[in-house]
Amino acid sequence: MKLFGTDGVRGEAGTFLTAELAMRVAMAAGIYFKAHSITNKILVGKDTRRSGYMIENAIVSGLTAIGYDVIQIGPMPTPAIAFITENMRCDAGIMISASHNSFEDNGIKFFDGRGDKLPHSVEEEIEKIFFDKDTILEAQTQGKYIGKAKRIDDVIGRYIVQLKNSFPRDLSLKDMRIVLDAANGAGYMVGPTVLEELGAEVIVLHNKPDGFNINDSCGALHTKDVCESVVKYRADLGIALDGDADRVVIVDENGVVVDGDQLLGALGAFMSDRGTLKGGGIVSTVMSNRGLDDFMSDKGLKLFRSDVGDKNVLEVMKKEGINFGGEQSGHVIISDFAKTGDGLVSALQVLALLLKTSQKASKALRPFALYPQKLVNIKVKTKKVLSEIDGLDEKLKELDENGVHHLVRYSGTENKLRVLLECKDAKKMNLYMDEMVEFFQKALNA
């Protein structure tokens, strides 16, 4: 069994992600962090899923059993956990969330003492410890060496200050009307608060979590409500977060969703014009639209590509000395202000762009033409090795010969195959997509 996917440990709560597994994962991670411990403290936060209570208690049990002290801060965005872990000088931070997934799923994400997500090599070390029963048994403490846990409810203020510091001091949102969809998730308190404190008039949607309604027909993956509300209330902008508020989808004043690659291009160019972009370029992923390449080139900037996942984006950013990158899906990293994707930091930079340029979102956030692109997610029974699927090489070669860019990969968190095609000829692209879907349905679900 493999524990870690593309973004921590994730699965259905109570079946894969049981209390027992959560406790053991926490013990394994704690054993790893103990070897490098400075403060003997680990921070634990969560989103608004009902199963978060079960998993949080299991994690606290596992960590205190091996002698760690635990600080519990309740529902907070994933980027807040990264920030507060470093701010409170903890050895590590743990976020309990399945991000954009529905309430049935949950997950466990780890951050080191600097607020960075763990590299794959560290995750592999933790997996080894997880499966080593003797190491787990030997690490358990007794008597006065057992750790303690305490809950702190006022750390939200630290994160709000950090968010406000990311917004230019010479600007105010006092003339802005904003619709915010909090996805009934971890950003339901901090999102409205920071926008209102910066002066905006905020219409808030889906900010009443009940443990089951997180991401339920709302948030970054379900934008119907925010789009309609922007038009209804004549708002300047719509902001849709996902369940743990590490990604954002922006809606213009006409109620139309802004493409994620367009957003990256607009923000990257804005930072370059202001002289705040470092490294001479931006980082995106292998799934980004080729139109973004053309736009960056026209601006005299480089576009570096990483594998999918904001952790991989950040690794390339560090390697190339770049402070801005992101994914088409809405994960945007501005490393001057955040160690991971941060939906609220990103939204504040969009608002700064609109105020500095005095432009409407519909114009400012669509600076280039996108190539026609289509992404289809195919549910699969098993994840066969792609290189071993008969006839696939020939199919991909045919796409190459006909000018169709392609990316085929399995989801790291779900039983799905993602097929992305891109071509200047939309009709050709759609025809080939129909063929590819039929091919994979037979190859993987027969």
From Swiss-Prot:
Q: Cross-referenced Gene3D superfamilies, in alphabetical order?
A: Alpha-D-Glucose-1,6-Bisphosphate, subunit A, domain 3 (3.40.120.10), Alpha-D-phosphohexomutase, C-terminal domain (3.30.310.50)
Cofactor mode of binding and number, as noted:
Binds 1 Mg(2+) ion per subunit.
Q: Which reaction does it catalyse?
A: alpha-D-glucosamine 1-phosphate = D-glucosamine 6-phosphate
What GO biological process terms does the UniProt entry carry, in alphabetical order?
Answer: carbohydrate metabolic process; peptidoglycan biosynthetic process; UDP-N-acetylglucosamine biosynthetic process
Q: Where does Mg(2+) bind?
A: S99, D242, D244, D246
For this UniProt record, the keywords arranged alphabetically read as follows: Isomerase, Magnesium, Metal-binding, Phosphoprotein
Q: What is its EC number?
A: 5.4.2.10
Look up the record and name the cofactor or cofactors this protein needs.
Mg(2+)
InterPro entries found in the cross-reference section = A-D-PHexomutase_a/b/a-I, A-D-PHexomutase_a/b/a-I/II/III, A-D-PHexomutase_a/b/a-II, A-D-PHexomutase_a/b/a-III, A-D-PHexomutase_C, A-D-PHexomutase_C_sf, Alpha-D-phosphohexomutase_SF, GlmM_bact
One short Pfam name that applies is PGM_PMM_I
> What does the PTM comment of the record read?
Activated by phosphorylation.
Q: Which GO terms describe its molecular function?
A: magnesium ion binding; phosphoglucosamine mutase activity; phosphomannomutase activity
Q: Name one GO cellular component term.
A: cytosol
Annotated active site: S99
Organism superkingdom:
Bacteria
Record PTM Phosphoserine, positions in chain: S99
Q: HAMAP family of this UniProt entry? A: GlmM_B
Q: What does this protein do?
A: Catalyzes the conversion of glucosamine-6-phosphate to glucosamine-1-phosphate.
Q: Which family does it belong to?
A: Belongs to the phosphohexose mutase family.
Protein name in UniProt: Phosphoglucosamine mutase
Q: What's the source species for this entry? A: Sulfurimonas denitrificans (strain ATCC 33889 / DSM 1251)
Gene for this chain: glmM
